[in-house]
Amino acid sequence: MQGPWVLLLLGLRLQLSLGVIPAEEENPAFWNRQAAEALDAAKKLQPIQKVAKNLILFLGDGLGVPTVTATRILKGQKNGKLGPETPLAMDRFPYLALSKTYNVDRQVPDSAATATAYLCGVKANFQTIGLSAAARFNQCNTTRGNEVISVMNRAKQAGKSVGVVTTTRVQHASPAGTYAHTVNRNWYSDADMPASARQEGCQDIATQLISNMDIDVILGGGRKYMFPMGTPDPEYPADASQNGIRLDGKNLVQEWLAKHQGAWYVWNRTELMQASLDQSVTHLMGLFEPGDTKYEIHRDPTLDPSLMEMTEAALRLLSRNPRGFYLFVEGGRIDHGHHEGVAYQALTEAVMFDDAIERAGQLTSEEDTLTLVTADHSHVFSFGGYTLRGSSIFGLAPSKAQDSKAYTSILYGNGPGYVFNSGVRPDVNESESGSPDYQQQAAVPLSSETHGGEDVAVFARGPQAHLVHGVQEQSFVAHVMAFAACLEPYTACDLAPPACTTDAAHPVAASLPLLAGTLLLLGASAAP
């Protein structure tokens, strides 16, 4: 077709939508020029051969490569683009590797043992956290002596401030890998443990959160695991199912507050914003739900902070330490959306995850901050069907299947989306497939969709980011971070000192007036 734009009708049957593809893409010069610019940038790329003052690890739980691509399309289309051509924030990182995610005892992994790998540098057994593979799942007596130490813990010992941010409960498998040692990832509180394990001296994960190490910032969900059984929840006081569940009668939040003179505990967005601006706050714990935080599509923006806002609040506090910081940020509910077989939930979580990466990049400098983005594992999630460019990622394939019914581009290999009534697969239309709660069809019936076993990507930017290359064991991630900051066992790293930045010039400091303005607006809206 000729003209300034090539118009494509994207969709057949009743699923018409209009996509606009630039006519210049028909000209080879467009692609040659684009490639030449990318090649020129690659030739100019120089490794930053200095010590990393700061370390940030962004973990997209379940963010396999197919999910990254689908997220790119969704985020691009949300911004009025066709989709696949629009880079994510993580796409702009200059270095890339693949990570092998298997556990010592499983070919397809879980989030506990993978956390041990990328956070502690040692591969482990399925459903265990912070322990070598000599430990056995659910056997309390195999814990002692098999503990492995996270890079975050080593950063704290080196004098850095440290923080954990997640959209799951803070006691969940991925964040727990920064501080806990347990043979069962589900031992969130003592109420979740068998009496025999408690008698043998094993500790629940919530107890380890406040006792194993001094964590400066803790933001996520998980209130009920911190309070005695029957303690009403501040957000849902009339709902007994949201009450505290601890059997030992301990108030772990109060115990944590008592340890630090400048500690604050918050449970909503307004309190978080206030605490993050208060220079007297040295430690900050924010628990915004009894369990996991709400999905982004269900989040109340006046009450619940987004992952991007939690990340910014953490950076504001941690960046005050002149010796630097370590921050772990997890987009944890990407994984949950996939397990439920609801791609809309998973991908909108992933878009917010990328927004948090983008904001962190604005608030830090790649000259002194090593930032890695990776996943713990993938999912049996795929999209295909020869869909036309610009069509909704949640839409239908342009042709019907052999049973003369439509099918969605996104499908799951297994999960709760399996529906076969009297030997007949249900039909689907564009309106159904675009619904936020639509469960994509699956090939095998399971109550919960499973992880995938393929390699995942590792994106890197900052000092020593060039070490992220090739195909590596997942445990390599932790070693790159430890080496970059000259932490154990790489204290003799012989790297040049980190780049110097002044408080006045620091991007986080520059953002304070904007945040103060946000608080004023919040106060005004709350006024009678």
Swiss-Prot record:
Disulfide bonds join 140-202, 486-493. Zn(2+) 2 binds at residues 335, 339, 451. GO terms for cellular component: extracellular region; plasma membrane; side of membrane. A lipid is attached at residue 503 (GPI-anchor amidated aspartate). InterPro entries: Alkaline_phosphatase, Alkaline_phosphatase_AS, Alkaline_phosphatase_core_sf. PANTHER family: ALKALINE PHOSPHATASE, INTESTINAL-TYPE ALKALINE PHOSPHATASE. This is Intestinal-type alkaline phosphatase. It comes from Homo sapiens. The gene is ALPI.
